[in-house]
C-alpha cells in the first residue's frame, strides 16, 4: 500500500507505458491512469487454498490486493496451470486473460560441482554420507513431518537433511524425532550461501518435496538440474515442475 498518488505521479512523469506487478499486486487505482497498461504476476493463492495457515488480517489484506490486481490488470501471468485454475475459480477471471509462464532456477545447479568442493561443503556442514534432501521454509504446509516419519522404514544409514528457514513447526518435527529416536538422522540447515547449495543438492541421494500446496516449486527444478531423482506430492503444481521423469505420491 505505497502512496497511490506518488506512484501515479511517477508513472506520468517518467512516461511509463507498462507497469508490471511482480508478486500478486498492483498499485491501487492504477486502472485510473488510462495511458498505462498493467500486467501482474500471480505466484499462488495459498492464502485462499490453505486459509488456516494465515491470520485473518493477513488473509484479508492478501485477498484484497490480489483480487484488485487480477480484476484491473490488462493481463495476468500465472506461474503454473495450477495457479491459473485458482485465479479462475476464486476470482472469476476469464481464462484468455491469463498466460502461464513457468519459472526457472539459477544456472549454478546445472554445473557439476567438483568432488573436492562437495567434500568441503559436506565437511563444513557436517553432512552425513547418505541423505535425502528437502529445501524450503520449515513450515506445516511443506509437510516435512512426512519425510521424518518415513525414516523409520528406511535403512539407518540414510539420513534426512532439511534446508530452510525454521518456524514454530520445527518443534513438531523435533518432538516426533525424540519419540521415534531419530534425532541423529535429521539435520537442519538454514542461512546457506547460494554457492554451497548446488553441492548439497548434488551430494544427496534423492530430493523429496511432499508440500501440500505450492504455486510452482522451484526447488524441484534445482534438484532436477542437479541430476538427482525427485519425489514430490500430487494435487497442486508439483507435477508441472517435475514433469514425467519424477515420482509422485499422494
Regions found by a protein language model. Give the residues of each.
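Carbohydrate transferase catalytic cores enriched for Leloir-type hexosyltransferases
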Residues: 1-250
